[in-house]
Every structure is written in structure tokens, then in C-alpha cells.
């Protein structure tokens, strides 16, 4: 697995314009009946973000952010691309970000609305194509997503005897107004983030 990221920010007064582009590739061999099967994939992501600091004092600050995004992913088996797994999503996101300093602790909160528009070369999701571009009530995902998200995190240092420790907590929620593709659903994580989880199966939800 390998990846690269490029980021550039241009501040102007209370405004900030930023651009981020990244890509990653991975390759793995899976055991098959007639020998190892080569499975590979790659992804490309880009976003342009405009933010504005709307309030700030010595204990808190609030920022509004508008960004346009494009993300693409594809997978291949034995050098043959899987058409159903070639996904391109483009759209915009508006968010309200707040940071509160409470003593030595930092509390962050974000409310956001993400909208897939079909722009930036987006492709209909495989789920849309299978059900006539959204004509079926059993549609399981769309590239024109409508998604609300909320996130709160707390980072607080503390001492236990002579030991200096730090608490980090994160709560995340989302509310979908459209069926979501796997890339936008919640997942339990992987073998490196959940103890005792082998990664062979996954638990996902919208």
C-alpha cells in the first residue's frame, strides 16, 4: 500500500482558501482454488475548500466552511477492472466548526451537510444502474447523496499520580436523506482499529 498527498493553503484576513489532492494504491494476493489471485485498487481524491472565521476570542472560535469535492476509486482482479466498483462522486459540503478551550482541554464540534451533485465527472453508482438510475424503491445507494453529519471530540490531558496522561474521545453521527453507497456508510473499522476483529467480515450501517 502506498499513497501521496498534496495540500496548499492561502490565507487572506479571516478567509482561507485551501486545495488538497491525494491518491493511494494497494495490492494484495488472495488464496484461490488454482493459486493466488491478484487483487488491486486505487483511489484519487481532490477538494477545494473556502473557510471563514466568523467568531474568535481567547476561549473559542467558530468557522464556516464551503468545499467542493471529487473522489474516485476502482478495483481490479487479475488486471481486469471490476466495472461495478469504479465509483466517481462529486459535489459540495457546507459545515459549521466550533472549537472551545476549557482549561487545558480542547472540545471540537462540527455540523455538516454533504450533497452529491453529479458534477466533476461523477458516475451513477452501480446500485443506481442496477435499479434504473433510482427508479426503484429498493435502491441501495446513489452518487447524488444527501447526508447530514455531526461530530464532537474531546482532548483532555490529566495526571494520575505522577503520570501524565491524555484522554481522547470522539462521537460521530450521521443522518442520510438518500440511500448510501459503502463509501459513505458507517463501518466497524478494521483489524488495526478494533481489538479481536479479523477484518474478514464487516458491520456497516447508514
Residue locations for each model-derived region?
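Gram-negative/organellar outer-membrane beta-barrel architecture
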Residues: 1-105
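C-terminal outer-membrane beta-barrel translocator/porin domains of Gram-negative envelope proteins
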Residues: 76-206
Amino acid at each position: 500500500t502506498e499513497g501521496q498527498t498534496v495540500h496548499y493553503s492561502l490565507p487572506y484576513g479571516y478567509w482561507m482558501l485551501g486545495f488538497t489532492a491525494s491518491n493511494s494504491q494497494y495490492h494484495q494476493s488472495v488464496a484461490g482454488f488454482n493459486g493466488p489471485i491478484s487483487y488491486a485498487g486505487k483511489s484519487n481524491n481532490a477538494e477545494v475548500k473556502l473557510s471563514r472565521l466568523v467568531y474568535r476570542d481567547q476561549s473559542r472560535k467558530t468557522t464556516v466552511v464551503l468545499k467542493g469535492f471529487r473522489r474516485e476509486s476502482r478495483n481490479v482482479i487479475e488486471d481486469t477492472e471490476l466495472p461495478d466498483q469504479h465509483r466517481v462522486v462529486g459535489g459540495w459540503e457546507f459545515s459549521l466548526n466550533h472549537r472551545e478551550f476549557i482549561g487545558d482541554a480542547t472540545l471540537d464540534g462540527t455540523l455538516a451537510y454533504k450533497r452529491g451533485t453529479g458534477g466533476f465527472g461523477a458516475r451513477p453508482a452501480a446500485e443506481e444502474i442496477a435499479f434504473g438510475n433510482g427508479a426503484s424503491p429498493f435502491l441501495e445507494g446513489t452518487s447524488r447523496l444527501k447526508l447530514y453529519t455531526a461530530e464532537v471530540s474531546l482532548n483532555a490531558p490529566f495526571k494520575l499520580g505522577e503520570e501524565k496522561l491524555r484522554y481522547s474521545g470522539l462521537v460521530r453521527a450521521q443522518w442520510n436523506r438518500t440511500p448510501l453507497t459503502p463509501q459513505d456508510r458507517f463501518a466497524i473499522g478494521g483489524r488495526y482499529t478494533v481489538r479481536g476483529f479479523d477484518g474478514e467480515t464487516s458491520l456497516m450501517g447508514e
